[in-house]
């Protein structure tokens, strides 16, 4: 499913009945959130608010409101095909030379996709059709949503932040929320371990007192946005990965005021800088946990230039207690994670991040257990292998006879195969999401692993329970007379209804 930019993608959605245009005036203050929330919970379409109250710029919401649309954004027809994206990423993380002619033939599609990795640099681009600078820069003219009643101010949610550390060729792309505090100022809420924050720290060390260049793309194409939230190998840029997903090279253009490269077809680009030491209190905001988070200090992003397309569209979302758009993204990206984990840990059968667990705070893993202590090794692997699971507080490991996506199965395994003292692993003083107010210290807390597997010799000295199995011959005999019994059919055999 190929597309060029966000507008091209919206046209595809509209053809499939996946986009609804809202012509009635709707207020970005709370009203858009209410409509988007109801629509998402009903599995409804993406929403294009064409007449935001008080603004002339349309607002796009709920773009990734269903797993199907996430898959479409990644160039796939359905969610099941995302496993192929995961296999490609697993291959790129640890590429292996072909083992023979047949293996070479099997890997040709992967090698062909790699041809779309290099970016294409343009001299002029749609995102620079209009250029605003100086006093003309006014962020309040953008219909930035305020999502919840006690939010501190309007909040940019889908800003694709572009940074580059000193002496680095590769740029970093990250999604960081940004609080509006003035006509040309935003607060950049990036956590200390994120790529943008690390680039800034390195810049401050290498260039004391100098301004740090930053650009933010709003309304980039879906593949580029999704590339910024996917476990891309460190050797692969997000732009290159977006090209793989889209099937065409990512087009970029150099910014007007700095050397950063942004998506050429983005709807809006904010260019500016962060002054070292310029901090401001951010929040509170309702977030994906379903609570308002605490106030904390983060760097101030000063916007010097706004470039945009003619008739630009502002792309936004809201976050709240699941289900919300990040939770839906988590459900879809779960399918990408599975092959990557299986490449490193072949014993993993399935991996599931329940959306009600805020998408990443709890994981259920099923394995083909091979030795005593195996479950604990897998726990440690999940916590350490991908940085996306750095904040996963709970890891439950079960045998492969358990369906990781069925709570009835998982709870049965926990309550029948676990001894709390023996089979619970607690790890203290580990990195924790700064939004997790339950941790004793901001950004630092504990993790729990639950070994809900059958226990092997060395893990127990007792005779282990044997699962009850039905007699297949009896089951077959009852299957043959079940309709005639008419137990669940209002007393009438199937043939008489």
UniProtKB/Swiss-Prot annotation:
Cellular localization per UniProt: Cell membrane
Cofactor note: Binds 1 prenylated FMN per subunit.
Cofactor list: prenylated FMN; Mn(2+)
Positions with a binding annotation for Mn(2+): 172, 238
GO molecular function: 3-octaprenyl-4-hydroxybenzoate carboxy-lyase activity; metal ion binding
Cited InterPro entries: UbiD (IPR002830), UbiD-like_C (IPR049381), UbiD-like_N (IPR049383), UbiD_bacteria (IPR023677), UbiD_Rift_dom (IPR048304)
Catalytic activity: a 4-hydroxy-3-(all-trans-polyprenyl)benzoate + H(+) = a 2-(all-trans-polyprenyl)phenol + CO2
Source species, domain of life: Bacteria
Membrane-related topology note: Peripheral membrane protein
Pathway, per record: Cofactor biosynthesis; ubiquinone biosynthesis
Signal peptide bounds: none
Record-annotated active site: 287 (proton donor)
Pfam family, one: UbiD_N
Alphabetical keyword list: Cell membrane, Decarboxylase, Flavoprotein, FMN, Lyase, Manganese, Membrane, Metal-binding, Ubiquinone biosynthesis
Metal-binding recorded as keyword: yes
Record GO biological process: ubiquinone biosynthetic process
GO cellular component assignments: cytosol; plasma membrane
EC number: 4.1.1.98
Positions annotated to bind prenylated FMN: 175-177, 189-191, 194-195
Function per UniProt: Catalyzes the decarboxylation of 3-octaprenyl-4-hydroxy benzoate to 2-octaprenylphenol, an intermediate step in ubiquinone biosynthesis.
Family the UniProt entry places it in: Belongs to the UbiD family.
NCBIfam families in the cross-refs: PRK10922.1 (NF008175), UbiD family decarboxylase (TIGR00148)
PANTHER family listed in its UniProt record: 3-OCTAPRENYL-4-HYDROXYBENZOATE CARBOXY-LYASE-RELATED (PTHR30108), FERULIC ACID DECARBOXYLASE 1 (PTHR30108:SF17)
Oligomer and partners: Homohexamer.
Name of the molecule in the record: 3-octaprenyl-4-hydroxybenzoate carboxy-lyase
